[in-house]
């Protein structure tokens, strides 16, 4: 329909599905409390799937007048200067624009007091819902009474409190790195684990250490080092791990920035990546393949997380039941993890 006879319309969608145009309108553009009651679950699903397929875009001004919604979504992230966060936000903005929505984004710097203050500020903008990308595992900031009655979803990070989230399968990603190191014969391995309050760090670490434990090679506690998700934190943690005579032969850094910091520490100590030390990161940011020693990394679907978070939020706004979604990771092997140094453990 799109590209053949002009913009996709509610009437055109209704005709394709054999429904009354008012039913389609209520499902796609009705007030949030009524969308879930406008049609049966199966009919609403068919309407939304066809609207997605055809690229239907509501008129935000007309919809706002009709529904008394602001068509504004609040977005909270730790800091947009980080490439992973920026890429996720690109997905959020792309999908929101496609759905006739605008976004209002703010940084919280992973500080609980700032999180609470920014949540209040964003809610003051009369947003229809929130996408929260800075959640801590304990979910403390999300217990703010100000959020009562406001639909929200999490992206990139989950909580232990069960809020709906769109994330990468971080445990599986960590497990993939462990299997790669095991295949190369590495028995003495360490993890630069990121911040303990973030599910991204804890889940990736757990996936890695669980796989080594299954292989009969549990990691000593001092070979799991927490640090900031940045190059400076990775450099400090790696320097501590690599400075003594009892050092690991392989390191898994739970994000690429910490892995790049590890590269700097290895350089300072005269260690050759891929020879004296195997290294892997996580997220497969664009820089990973272009480094002097290309970085083995777990590719996570960053922009797709953002797009799916918008879709999940819209279902919550419509009053539909939703469940968390985990997207599959992919290990991309490059020179930094080197060659086989011994037989895999039996």
Language model features with spans:
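Short acidic capping loops at alpha-helix termini that bridge into adjacent secondary structure
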Residues: 187-189, 219-223, 272-278
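Alpha-helical recognition/docking segments in bacterial nutrient-uptake
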Residues: 1-5, 67-179, 183, 197, ...
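Periplasmic-binding protein-like
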Residues: 126-134, 190-193, 224, 245-255, ...
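Flexible loop/turn connectors
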Residues: 239-346
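Hinge/beta->alpha junction and helix N-cap segments in small-molecule ligand-binding domains
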Residues: 60, 77-87, 106-114, 140, ...
């Amino acid at each position: 329909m799109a590209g053949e006879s002009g913009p996709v319309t509610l009437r055109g969608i209704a005709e394709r599905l054999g429904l009354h145009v008012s039913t389609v309108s209520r499902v796609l553009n009705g007030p949030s409390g009524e969308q879930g009651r406008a049609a049966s679950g199966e009919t609403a699903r068919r309407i939304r799937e066809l609207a997605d397929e055809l690229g239907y875009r509501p008129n935000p001004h007309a919809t706002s007048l009709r529904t008394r919604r602001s068509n504004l979504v609040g977005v909270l992230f730790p800091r947009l200067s980080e490439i992973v966060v920026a890429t996720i936000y690109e997905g959020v903005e792309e999908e929101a624009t496609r759905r006739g929505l605008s976004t209002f984004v703010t940084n919280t710097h992973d500080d609980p007091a700032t999180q609470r203050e920014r949540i209040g500020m964003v809610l003051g903008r009369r947003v229809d819902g929130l996408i929260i990308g800075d959640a801590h595992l304990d979910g403390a900031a999300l217990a703010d009474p100000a959020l009562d009655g406001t639909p929200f979803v999490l992206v990139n990070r989950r909580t232990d409190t069960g809020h709906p989230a769109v994330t990468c399968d971080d445990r599986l990603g960590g497990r993939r790195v462990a299997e790669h190191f095991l295949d190369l014969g590495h028995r003495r391995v360490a993890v630069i684990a990121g911040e303990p309050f973030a599910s991204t760090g804890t889940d990736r670490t757990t996936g890695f250490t669980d796989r080594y434990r299954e292989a009969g090679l549990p990691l000593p506690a001092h070979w799991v080092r927490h640090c900031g998700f940045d190059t400076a934190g990775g450099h400090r943690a790696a320097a501590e791990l690599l400075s003594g005579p009892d050092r690991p032969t392989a390191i898994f850094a739970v994000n690429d920035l910490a892995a790049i910091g590890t590269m700097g520490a290895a350089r300072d100590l005269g260690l050759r990546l891929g020879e004296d030390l195997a290294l892997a990161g996580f997220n497969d940011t664009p820089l990973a393949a272009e480094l002097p020693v290309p970085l083995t990394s777990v590719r996570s679907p960053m922009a797709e997380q953002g797009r799916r978070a918008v879709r999940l939020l819209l279902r919550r706004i419509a009053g539909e039941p939703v469940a968390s979604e985990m997207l599959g990771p992919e290990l991309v092997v490059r020179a930094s993890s080197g060659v086989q140094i011994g037989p895999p453990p039996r």
